Amino acid sequence: MGKIKLKNRKALVVYDNKDDFEKNQTFALSLIKELQKKKLNAEVLLLENKDINFEAKINEAELILNRSRKVDFLKTNNQINTFLVNPFNVVFIANDKYETYKWLKQNRFLTVNSSLLSKETIKSFPVIVKKRNSHGGKDVHLVNSADEIKHLNIENATEWIVQPFLSIGTVEYRAYILFGKIIKVIKKISNANQFKANFSQGAEVSLFKLKWFTKRKIKKIAKRLREGYYAIDFFLNRYNRVIVNEIEDAAGARALVQLCPDLNITKIIIRTIISKFKKFLKKKLIS
């Protein structure tokens, strides 16, 4: 079998809309640049711009880096003939917090108890109420009474989950995962005015070294999720046991870039993706 050639093969970096792209523009364009270095014909595609060439671009792409947190734009053909990063299962599990909870429980990983929002599911206060598709700390609320829930903009309760408030939640850890391997881990500490430890909302961040048994647990979770680039957000209880909070599909890298300015994260990501992509293409040729 001859060498797999990448020249002029079509690749897409997909974002949902212009605002999302502009927020992550440096990262997105760096991904494009690294793909072009590998001789691929790469471009950014926004899902909100469904022009006459939209379907053709999706169908022609052999490699799609899906940063949109959505899968409904992909066809059956893409599932078979396109190398997707992240794959369907990661996108589906990570972008619905109730599905994340169910998947973690099914696989017997410790996580924060979650249930669909209703009067019956709240036994005591305070609680955390969050939208199932929220990310970046948006639509996440600390609620101290039933009256406070009434003042939230909730139209459909089934789109929201409720969790117990954990005192350890002001310190959160994020493991950046690339095809089952841990790139780096950061520690996030919420500022005095916040109960959530999000970098985009002013959390203090630092690099963190995992103990061997914690690393083993994170790798076990990553192995079950399989391939892709994503992040696992977790807490550590007083026994240093991992309690998974969320799985971040379109994981941002701003905190990592700030802490590791010499780490070319997009180069590492694309180098690994290209290696996997070549294996995918070889497998297609054989079959």
Curated annotation (Swiss-Prot):
Annotated coiled-coil segments of the chain: none
Domain ATP-grasp: 115-287
UniProt cross-references to Gene3D superfamilies, sorted A to Z: ATP-grasp fold, A domain, ATP-grasp fold, B domain
Highest taxon of source: Bacteria
GO molecular function terms noted in the UniProt entry: ATP binding; metal ion binding; ribosomal S6-glutamic acid ligase activity
Gene Ontology CC terms, in alphabetical order: cytoplasm
One of the protein's GO biological processes: SOS response
Xref: InterPro entries: ATP-grasp (IPR011761), ATP-grasp_RimK-type (IPR013651), ATP_grasp_subdomain_1 (IPR013815)
One Pfam family, short name: RimK
PROSITE patterns attached to this UniProt entry: ATP_GRASP (PS50975)
Name listed for the protein in its UniProt record: Uncharacterized protein MG011
Organism: Mycoplasma genitalium (strain ATCC 33530 / DSM 19775 / NCTC 10195 / G37) (Mycoplasmoides genitalium)
